[in-house]
Amino acid sequence: ELESSGLVKRSAKGNLYDIFRHRVMVPIIDVRGNIIAFGGRVMDDSKPKYINSPETMVYHKSRTLFALNVAKKSTSKRYILCEGYMDVISMHEAGFDTAVCACGTALTPEQVKLLTEYADEVVLSYDSDEAGQKATARSLAMFTGTNLQVRVLNIPGAKDPDEFIRTYGRDRFEAVLEGTATPLEFKLAKAVKKYDLRNDAQRLQYVDEAIGILAGSAVSPTARDVYAGRIAEQTGIDKKAVLVQLESAVRGAGRRARRKEQNELSRQGIAADIRVPYDRG
């Protein structure tokens, strides 16, 4: 039973050993309150940093969110999606009781579906390093088409929420939480970091990328005007010129979307110009 639960493994010599030895163990509990697995974290710099229970008859990591059993009891419908167990634990200790995280995997469609059942808003609170930012971008794409409002947390002066809360305290984190970015703002902020805006060529490259992001996003004409103003202010390029290029890009994106839709209809054999002959027999 211990082997099938994933708590122990058998060595090459046939001896059983504890796979979580020298680690802090974190119980993973399902929404009904049953312990179904464990995560184990080292307390030094040894690798791997985390070890998780293998999948069993009752534990499917792609369908499980750590601490959802606690978060679902909260009156708040704003969930905070973290990168690791320790971030979640720190948040709960500080009173943010809707913090959850995936269990040793990247976010999965099944976990997104779980969130839609309990949350109205999801704040992505991943690490501030490059890997965390890439994970944020991947996760944002997975929420496309859901009814959830998604925001992105920027953690200044710390590598993750756990470090930020321990360094600056709960109130500072609450203030940061209230200043989250929309997915569009996150993408634009990520784009501008890639360019030296003092360089003419890079400034134009940034404008092209930013306009591509805006043209591919479902935003109102008013919002496009606001973002065009920000791009103009960042780059020193006339706002009217930015708007002209943006409107051209929006029209181009619309044409491409219509062509893609028509091609898909044609592929399925139900394009508007296809008619099935009437069989008089």
Feature locations, PLM:
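Phosphate-handling DNA/RNA-contact segment within nucleic-acid enzymes
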Residues: 1-118, 122, 135-136
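A charged alpha-helical hairpin associated with nucleic-acid processing machineries
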Residues: 30-32, 71-79, 106-122, 127-281
